[in-house]
Amino acid sequence: MVKNQAQKKGVKRKQVKNIPSGVVHVKATFNNTIVTITDPAGNVISWASAGKVGYSGSRKSSAFAATVAAQDAAKAAMSSGLKEVEVGLKGTGAGRESAVRALISSGLIVSVIRDETPVPHNGCRPRKRRRV
């Protein structure tokens, strides 16, 4: 007698973990904004991007799309018990500040905001300048 599909196929059911604190990684590029929420060890709890929440093309690079993506990721992470986060910002896109504001307004306590934008110490040669 099989009780449900999970027992039938031998698939483990996803357990809801209680994680009180975590790290939010916001990658704001010129084309998109990606928000990843991890536990302190680096295991991903939830993620969202402007493309995942339904925006496409040039609308993905807007600040409002970053706000919606941050709210979506925060809501999914708060369902697993997340309350306090540290924020790491990477990149120079339009959604940097608006993503942090959305995290605060969604109910997460932001303890630290760090800028982790990679800056080369004169490493690789950049692409040629765009002439429009």
Curated annotation (Swiss-Prot):
SUPFAM superfamilies: Translational machinery components (SSF53137)
Keyword Ribosomal protein: yes
Keyword line: Ribonucleoprotein, Ribosomal protein, RNA-binding, rRNA-binding
One Pfam family named in its UniProt record: Ribosomal_S11
GO cellular component, one term: cytosolic small ribosomal subunit
Gene Ontology annotations of biological process type: translation
InterPro entries, sorted: Ribosomal_uS11, Ribosomal_uS11_bac-type, Ribosomal_uS11_CS, Ribosomal_uS11_sf
One GO MF term: structural constituent of ribosome
Keyword RNA-binding set for record: yes
Family per similarity comment: Belongs to the universal ribosomal protein uS11 family.
Subunit details: Part of the 30S ribosomal subunit. Interacts with proteins S7 and S18. Binds to IF-3.
Purpose: Located on the platform of the 30S subunit, it bridges several disparate RNA helices of the 16S rRNA. Forms part of the Shine-Dalgarno cleft in the 70S ribosome.
Name this protein carries in UniProt: Small ribosomal subunit protein uS11
Lineage: Bacteria, Pseudomonadati, Chlamydiota, Chlamydiia, Chlamydiales
